[in-house]
A protein has these predicted regions:
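Hydrophobic residues at beta-strand termini and immediately following loops
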Residues: 9, 113, 133, 196, ...
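Cys-nucleophile CN-hydrolase/nitrilase-fold catalytic domain and related Cys-dependent amidase chemistry
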Residues: 18, 27-105, 172-191
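CN hydrolase (nitrilase-like) catalytic-core segments centered on the catalytic cysteine
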Residues: 64-84, 149-232
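Active-site-proximal beta-strand elements of phosphoester/diester hydrolases
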Residues: 3-15, 41, 99, 112, ...
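Short, acidic/polar
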Residues: 20-29, 148-155
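Conserved hydrophobic/aromatic positions in well-ordered beta-strands
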Residues: 7, 101-103, 213, 232
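Conserved residues at the C-terminal ends of beta-strands
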Residues: 43, 48, 116, 168, ...
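Active-site catalytic loop in hydrolytic enzyme cores
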Residues: 91-160, 174-180, 184, 188-191, ...
Length: 253
């Protein structure tokens, strides 16, 4: 059996407190690495929090990798795991994007995905590229939060050979909250989806009830919500594309 151990970092990120969030990510990644995980997934915009622009603006956003991401890459190399990191970025022509960076076990930046459906992010441009990331022979499509709202992005990943979907998100219940979209994407594509959500309350949205999930064939196999940061670990059978774990192993931070 080819077993994949995955850690979802269900984090209490604080909008606009970059240093706090970076320290939280580093702490959580180190703890997750102690569980011998293969992948670590953070929520959408884990570095900045969701509604950061209302507090600190956007002038601080850098081209990547910046100094912190280079230091973080060194950490990733030292713990020998793969990381999906949600972080704003500035392109070399000055556009801003809501991006997930994929770092390999060697600490190398091997892929990026810019959020396609950025209409609700008033500070960011919409990405255009939809290419699965190859992680050790496994092709992974990245659905950033509302990119799961319609079938466009997920179907594109499927057509390009994706075998697993991951969903770094900041999406809680309430007005315009998730309403079966994640489940439907797994039905549309036949692919499993691992959703890494978050907790906390931002300027105008709340995530206390937001759920991190493992979904297959339209069914929620695992779910977690909490009022504090937590590392959620589970095992996945890559050969049969089936869940091994009966529940998340939860470690609170």
């Amino acid at each position: 059996m080819r077993r994949l151990k995955i850690a979802l970092l269900h984090l209490l990120s604080i909008a606009g407190d970059i240093k706090y969030n970076q320290n939280l990510i580093e702490e959580a990644v180190k703890l997750a690495a102690g569980k011998n995980v293969d992948w670590i997934i953070t929520p959408e915009l884990a570095v900045s929090g969701l509604q950061f622009s209302q507090k600190i603006g956007v002038d601080w956003i850098n081209e990547q990798p910046d100094e912190w991401l280079r230091t973080f890459s060194t950490l990733v190399r030292s713990i020998n795991t793969n990381v999906f990191l949600g972080c704003p970025e500035k392109s070399d022509t000055g556009e801003l994007y809501n991006t997930v960076f994929v770092l390999s076990r060697k600490g190398e930046l091997i892929g990026t995905q810019r959020k396609i459906s950025s209409i609700t992010d008033n500070w960011s441009n919409s990405g255009t590229d939809m290419v699965p990331v190859d992680l050790g022979g496994i092709k992974v499509g990245i659905l950033i939060c509302a990119d799961a709202f319609t079938n466009k992005v997920a179907d594109t990943f499927l057509s390009k050979g994706a075998e697993i979907l991951v969903g770094p998100s900041s999406w809680g219940p309430g007005l315009h909250g998730p309403n079966g979209e994640w489940e439907q994407r797994t039905i549309d594509t036949g692919l499993p989806l691992f959703v890494c959500n978050r907790t906390v309350e931002d300027e105008s949205v709340t995530f206390w009830e937001a759920e991190s999930l493992v979904i297959k064939n339209g069914k929620r196999l695992l779910s977690h919500k909490s009022v504090h940061s937590a590392i959620l670990t589970f095992d996945w059978d890559l050969e049969n594309m089936e869940l091994i774990s009966s529940d998340f192993e939860v470690q609170c931070l």
